[in-house]
Amino acid sequence: MSDINGTRLPIPGLIPLGIPCVSDDVNPTLTRGER
């Protein structure tokens, strides 16, 4: 699990896809920092 987008998510599949909407539902705190 590497922070490719500077955000560590429990689901690595969401990182390469680049779906902030789905990631926001998982970790809203981390995604807010990415925005």
Swiss-Prot record:
Keyword Transit peptide: no
Post-translational modification: Processed by the macrocyclase-peptidase enzyme POPB to yield a toxic cyclic decapeptide. POPB first removes 10 residues from the N-terminus. Conformational trapping of the remaining peptide forces the enzyme to release this intermediate rather than proceed to macrocyclization. The enzyme rebinds the remaining peptide in a different conformation and catalyzes macrocyclization of the N-terminal 10 residues.
Propeptide: 1-10, 21-35
InterPro entries: Amanitin/phalloidin
Superkingdom assignment: Eukaryota
Record-stated family: Belongs to the MSDIN fungal toxin family.
Known role: Probable toxin that belongs to the MSDIN-like toxin family responsible for a large number of food poisoning cases and deaths.
Name recorded for this polypeptide: MSDIN-like toxin proprotein 6
Organism: Amanita bisporigera
Gene that encodes it: MSD6
